[in-house]
């Protein structure tokens, strides 16, 4: 579950029209949220408050072996933050839970009447206790397509790190330059979205896919340690059910690691994901499986959810990546005129020839819209997550939900191993696998 400040940062990106999914760092977000979700390993309580429309603060305490805590402050000059950020009682569980991502990167950044809202800033500071650790972050939108982020960590033992991110997003391409004082690490990320060519006979449903290719290169100047990887992502919808699905393929040429994932929403309340890893050098492989199940409440649509649905419905088509391939509105279309009987006959023949295809297009479009609306209108109150791996031989469970105005997250991880083999040498005939919990934790959040 997202922390309150992470949730506020997501809403800041939404307010300034910054696309979270159009980034190489988040190209594997769908499978990562289902397979590699974090499991809490301690008790943590977080109390947050939206004191003014532009300031937010959080106080949290957590205990594992010793008592710790922190205080966090955030300020932003972005507009409509008081409407985007909700308290824990009225917030939608989907907004604070990392789940399947519906990839719709922007096609282009077009000037809008609210263009000044893109050039905004966010200031973040965190102080921990009893250890005097400090964290700071600055996000500055330079223009509609460029953003600068600075992150700083300072600890009492003199371990200080400053990291800078320069990002340029045109919708079709995303460039990102990273520099850090930790070993003088330098990196470059790039993501390219392939767009289909618009056609008179093909609409977004025949070209209903998102194909993205990206890569990253890293170099530690102090240690001269290189790193690189490349990933291909393909997103589409089922034409018969409207359910989305995502496939990815990742390759690391330095370590010879190949990874492929497949994630699909089997229904409006369930998602399944699989991942296969293979190493060309060691010939080792691993198969991972994960799923999540959402539970609906008695009230299917709250006013806050209905407001979000209306907001998505009123979004202009020119802000979506594939707006140029969407079917035109029949109310705004201009019918061609036939000046002769031969032309009228030709138009009638074309209408008869393509009537079945046009009906199929409308049916597929309706199926996708109905599936998305069914998810948006649902009032989910809890979600179960489960993942396992054949190599690690573990089982990870996580429950997240809402109760009496609180946001709760509880999880555990079970490992299947023989602890005696780690201490004493035991003959293979006496090996017996044990199933025991490796970690367990509970997190509570409350915000006003």
Curated annotation (Swiss-Prot):
Gene Ontology biological-process annotations: establishment of mitochondrion localization; mitochondrial genome maintenance; mitochondrial outer membrane translocase complex assembly; mitochondrion-endoplasmic reticulum membrane tethering; phospholipid transport; protein insertion into mitochondrial outer membrane
First-listed, main subcellular location of the protein, grouped into a coarse class: mitochondrion
Membrane topology listed for this record: Multi-pass membrane protein
Recorded domain comment: Lacks alpha-helical transmembrane segments, suggesting that it resides in the membrane via beta-sheet conformations similar to those predicted for other outer membrane proteins and porin.
Protein name listed in UniProt: Mitochondrial distribution and morphology protein 10
Gene responsible for this protein: MDM10
Compartments (UniProt record): Mitochondrion outer membrane
Leader sequence segment: none
Family membership noted in the UniProt record: Belongs to the MDM10 family.
GO-annotated cellular components: ERMES complex; SAM complex
Subunit-structure text: Component of the ER-mitochondria encounter structure (ERMES) or MDM complex, composed of MMM1, MDM10, MDM12 and MDM34. Associates with the mitochondrial outer membrane sorting assembly machinery SAM(core) complex.
Keywords assigned by UniProt, alphabetized: Membrane, Mitochondrion, Mitochondrion outer membrane, Transmembrane, Transmembrane beta strand
Organism this protein belongs to: Zygosaccharomyces rouxii (strain ATCC 2623 / CBS 732 / NBRC 1130 / NCYC 568 / NRRL Y-229)
Source taxon at top rank: Eukaryota
Entry-linked Pfam families: MDM10
InterPro entries referenced in this protein's UniProt entry, alphabetically: Mdm10 (IPR027539)
Protein task: Component of the ERMES/MDM complex, which serves as a molecular tether to connect the endoplasmic reticulum and mitochondria. Components of this complex are involved in the control of mitochondrial shape and protein biogenesis and may function in phospholipid exchange. MDM10 is involved in the late assembly steps of the general translocase of the mitochondrial outer membrane (TOM complex). Functions in the TOM40-specific route of the assembly of outer membrane beta-barrel proteins, including the association of TOM40 with the receptor TOM22 and small TOM proteins.
